[in-house]
Amino acid sequence: MNWRLVEFLYLLFIWDHILVQPSHQDPAATNQHVSKEFDWLISDRGPFHHSRSYLSFVERHRQGFTTRYKIYREFARWKVRNTAIERRDLLHNPLPLMPEFQRSIRLLGRRPTTQQFIDTIIKKYGTHILISATLGGEEALTMYMDKSRLDRKSGNATQSVEALHQLASSYFVDRDGTMRRLHEIQISTGAIKVTETRTGPLGCNSYDNLDSVSSVLLQSTESKLHLQGLQIIFPQYLQEKFVQSALSYIMCNGEGEYICRNSQCGCQCAEEFPQCNCPITDIQIMEYTLANMAKTWTEAYKDLENSDEFKSFMKRLPSNHFLTIASIHQHWGNDWDLQNRYKLLQSSLEAQRQKIQRTARKLFGLSVRCRHNPNHQLPRERTIQEWLTRVQSLLYCNENGFWGTFLESQRSCVCHGGTSLCQRPIPCIIGGNNSCAMCSLANISLCGSCNKGYKLYRGRCEPQNVDSERSEQFISFETDLDFQDLELKYLLQKMDSRLYVHTTFISNEIRLDTFFDPRWRKRMSLTLKSNKNRMDFIHMVIGISMRICQMRNSSLDPMFFVYVNPFSGSHSEGWNMPFGEYGYPRWEKIRLQNSQCYNWTLLLGNRWKTFFETVHIYLRSRTRLPSLLRNETGQGPVDLSDPSKRQFYIKISDVQVYGYSLRFNADLLRSAVQQVNQSYTQGGQFYSSSSVMLLLLDIRDRINRLAPPVAPGKPQLDLFSCMLKHRLKLTNSEIIRVNHALDLYNTEILKQSDQMTAKLC
């Protein structure tokens, strides 16, 4: 055995076994690389790239076995050292190199190029030489596992992996029993692959001839291989060039020279290899890895949908009525099992996101010097809103083997594949502000019963209408004078007597058919005094007309401000007519034939007609006066003989309000209001007098509907409260109680939203 040991020590560095071979790999093996923690082996650059264990790992990883578990033991026989390399005096004691290796060195010459070094030395003998190692034998059990299959088979991959570890740890105690059990698991699940390895002399086994047993190099944490660069056996003038050539071969794949400048190292590519700085293979592998990670991300969502927790959640959702996003969200938050499963999904996706980000950063870092621009988009996590929409789609767009996406705004499905067969019958909506109480058992899309205050009609709930004849007993909203707008305009032009409302003209500043100076504000009122004289009527205004006469060559242009009191009261309880705003009409000015008089007409029509008790008209003038006359007052007696002042005078010969009166039964309405007020004060149930409540709600709505226009976003004026105050003589507290009772009935019983109003009286 001694002569074999001596021969090994002197020839170790020139044998194929001791020189680490360059990484030549066939194309079929290139696609079998793995990344992540094995990046140092990527791109054919690892010293053990052709080792049997690494190739086996690559093959198993390609098949989906991502986890490797190995248990082994070694039997060291010899510690060997390369004593020839330890010599320091290489000139006087030259190394016993093989003639072929010496001939290769001589062929290099004094100034070899990088390509000569690669072709002559590196491709044949490698880049490193073995200094010391351990020879002996090794036996090992290697097990490759696919955790995804273990998860599907057992339901808990962590416990399964731990059980396999415990089983494999008994390999050296009961080899036959352990292997038999592992092979059974391998055949039944297909989730593991088991390999036994036994090389070299093992233990104290009896061998007929120990020299006939080939020892192997042991490679473990206890038995390390010590390597050194091959340049130590070259002459000094070749050592630096060899190191540069080796780096160019390893880092640039022999397609350029590896150069470091200003702490920045890179490949200077040859003309025939302009992309030598671009690791195409690495980039393709990482892009493939990112694509697989994106698939894993999508599969994580499918795993949640296929989980028992999610299926149980879907079964518990009510199916007898329509589920909105808000109601599904409430059920989602109340399911604790689903919440725990969803948290596991979020944690796994967070870990997956970090892996994707790390790989993407490496990908973009590798492609800095490439013409190839990687195109990668990080997967986006599905939000809670998207999960709730997904639940809706599973409920209502999963029929006849087709799938689709549900649109709640349209209450319909968008089926995938261009068909319309995926939509199931959409249940009716109940609860909340909806009128339906229960869906129909015969057809779930239609309503089966309605809430109080509604009636069922053809599968829909409609508000219970108040009897029009009974409503007319309180206020006669419908009269014979409800003409169309064109008819009203024609009648106003003809000054039809049917539209006259006989009002009382009151003014301390103006006399009809008398000239006056309008340069200061003038006030006049047209009132009915219905609280005293016409108690059984309320009045509607549909137009106003004034006849204004001016002096010849007058430059005055009157301007009116009109305030309306709907049911009497003080001036502060009136509202101003917004001429030309929010669609409100303007004054129309028509000159009378052969006269200096004009008819000023305001036509409200059916759209802007409203209640009135008193109309206040404020008159000012827009006039173009000389600067000397602007400071003169318009007060004092009218002097028609003065030509300089006469041109400013005007007179109003006629003022008329057009409209009609509605019969008003104050006593009957007061009794209905007092009934509601008493019920509210005693805390009674509102639905006990639902007919009265519906009647008053209808009257309030029809009265407030005639309120004047307001700016967008602002509430309408409350005319109903003004009527209660001035025509029924209710106190403020009684008015508040009545309105509150009506609001409660509207929201609690009828499930309708209240319309905000602004206080006027």
Swiss-Prot record:
Keyword annotations:
Cell cycle, Cytoplasm, Glycoprotein, Growth arrest, Neurogenesis, Signal
Question: Which GO cellular component does the record give, naming just one?
Answer: neuronal cell body
**A biological process (GO) annotation for this entry?**
central nervous system neuron differentiation
Chief subcellular location equals cytoplasm
InterPro entries linked to this entry: BRINP (IPR033237), MACPF (IPR020864)
Which Pfam families does UniProt cross-reference here?
A: BRINP, EGF_BRNP1-3, MACPF
**Residues glycosylated per entry:** 156, 433, 443, 553, 599, 631, 677
Which cellular compartments is it found in? Cytoplasm
Q: Where is the MACPF domain?
A: 68-251
Q: Which residues form the signal peptide?
A: 1-22
* Coiled-coil spans in chain: none
Function statement: Plays a role in neurogenesis and brain development. May suppress cell cycle progression in postmitotic neurons by inhibiting G1/S transition.
Family statement drawn from the similarity comment of this UniProt entry:
Belongs to the BRINP family.
Which protein, by its recorded name, is this?
A: BMP/retinoic acid-inducible neural-specific protein 1
